[in-house]
Amino acid sequence: MQQRRKSVFASAPFAMKQAALGAGVAARRNGAPLSLAAVVFALFVFATFLYNEDIKSIADFPFGAGALRAKSPDLHVLQETVGAAHLAAGSIAKRGEEVIVRVLDAPASTAMAAAAGSSSNNSTIEVAKANANANANAADAGVKVDEGQERERDVTLPSVKEGGADEARRREDEEAAEKESSAKAAAATAALRTVVSVPDTCDLYRGNWVYDEVNAPVYKESQCEFLTEQVTCMRNGRRDDSYQKWRWQPTDCDLPRFDARLLLERLRNKRLMFVGDSLNRNQWESMVCLVQSVIPKGKKTLTKFVNGGNSNIFYAHEYNATVEFYWAPFLVESNSDNPQVHSVPDRVIQWHSIAKHAHNWLGVDYLIFNTYIWWLNTLDMKVLKGSFDQGATEYVEVDRPVAYKEVLKTWAKWVDRNIDPNRTTVFFMSMSPNHITPEAWGNYGGIKCAMETLPITNRTTSLDVGTDWRLYAGAQEVLQTFRRVPVHLVDITALSELRKDAHTSVHTLRQGKLLTPEQQSDPKTYADCIHWCLPGLPDTWNQFLYARIASAPWSSDQ
């Protein structure tokens, strides 16, 4: 057992007690009775002993507790400082920054007091004593902390990402923004899902050409990267651009202005295909330029000579829509079906054979057919006896209008049997005219369409520029024979006859090469009065298509 320590106040009375006890023993030995003084002395010694025990008790508990309580305010201050630092750190850490908090180390006496909390009773007593002395010194100094005893240390708090509440708020904000964006997109789509108004009583093809520098052209030559050199007349040296600024004005109504976004919305997840000869390719290039103007770069592509070389395909990525051209100059099979090698002097057709081409037309949502210019090479058409696949070479010559009508009958039968009218809309383009006889419009001494800069206007007599209207009549008859599938005639012939100024003339290609200056100076030989500059007349043809497509009711699957 540990020996009990004596109070400092007990040392002197203890010696006196020993002396008194010695004297008492001697007195009893002598048989002398205890005196009053001895009794008083004994009481004094007993009181002193009790006092000593109280001092021990106080030293064990109250002094230690009192010392710890005396330092508690300093610990609370430290905790509050660190807590505030953590709050500040949390705010900064949301931004992903590293946080450094400067913390003051407590004086040595405070550290001793903190350590004493986990020590034995004896250690607690020693610490309590030390803290008691420190408190006394602090009190004497006016409770002033000696800053020289404080030591600073940097505590780096870990960077943290946004907390759960902040993450939830961020997600809510993102969801709200996404909903708002979706709502705006839906509203924009709804706005595009309009139906263009074209009065049923209005004949769009009867009217006049009006010069309009404000609204024409719809696009610029330099802004359409997909134009071929065959049609870029300004780039190829043409000096006037007035041919681009004539707008067709129907007599009894207005031709709806082309809206590329509205048409693309109609074409979403759909295919539009031009089928026919180089004039339909001319119109296809126009349509590509009309729609591509509102599509950002990187979201549109053009692929040429696919499907065995017969197809060119423009793809609008965002709309999952295609604008395609399929080469079939006679619609039926012929010896001119190779789009890259088709300059065949003796053109032969297989007038009842269309399946080779037609299987490529299945599943298309808008089909635009034409066939004309390749029929004008000779007065009679050569019709194959047998088939190309079997190597047949014999043919018979048939009058052009008869052969033309027979080919259109073959085409009409296939359309009526294979096209779903609930899905596919079919158009037929009437003939695109040539301008190779300038005397027809009163330019005696002129050379074809060369140097023409104005349309034919204010005519009071009929115009004959060489169009074979017999073929036009044959097409009209065949179009009346359809039973299941309605086919819409786009009647461009008469209004296009007025545009002698709009051909490529000498500002074009010949056999894949641009005309040289020497060739351009010889329009009688090299002027192309068949095809059209772009921007130009084919843009108006496509406005007619647009008016028909955009004025139709929206189908249930759109």
UniProtKB/Swiss-Prot annotation:
E.C. designation(s): 2.3.1.-
Record family assignment: Belongs to the PC-esterase family. TBL subfamily.
InterPro entries, sorted: TBL (IPR029962), TBL_C (IPR026057), TBL_N (IPR025846)
Species per Swiss-Prot/TrEMBL record: Oryza sativa subsp. japonica (Rice)
Name of the protein described by the UniProt record: Xylan O-acetyltransferase 6
Region named Disordered: 140-184
The keyword Transcription regulation belongs to this UniProt entry's keyword annotation: no
Tissue: Expressed in leaves.
Pfam family, one: PC-Esterase
Positions annotated with a glycan in the UniProt record: N122, N320, N422, N458
Transmembrane annotation, as ranges: 31-51
Alphabetically ordered keywords of this record: Disulfide bond, Glycoprotein, Golgi apparatus, Membrane, Signal-anchor, Transferase, Transmembrane, Transmembrane helix
Disulfide topology: C202-C253, C224-C289, C233-C533, C449-C529
List of catalytic residues: S278 (nucleophile), D528 (proton donor), H531 (proton acceptor)
Renumbered ranges of motif DXXH motif: 528-531
Record topology, Lumenal segments: 52-558
Protein's GO biological process: xylan acetylation
Enzyme class: transferase
Stretches with biased composition (Basic and acidic residues): 143-155, 163-182
Membrane protein topology class: Single-pass type II membrane protein
Cytoplasmic side: 1-30
GO MF annotation, one: O-acetyltransferase activity
Renumbered ranges of motif GDS motif: 276-278
A cellular component annotation (GO) from this entry: Golgi apparatus
Role summary: Xylan acetyltransferase required for 2-O- and 3-O-monoacetylation of xylosyl residues in xylan. Catalyzes the 2-O-acetylation of xylan, followed by nonenzymatic acetyl migration to the O-3 position, resulting in products that are monoacetylated at both O-2 and O-3 positions.
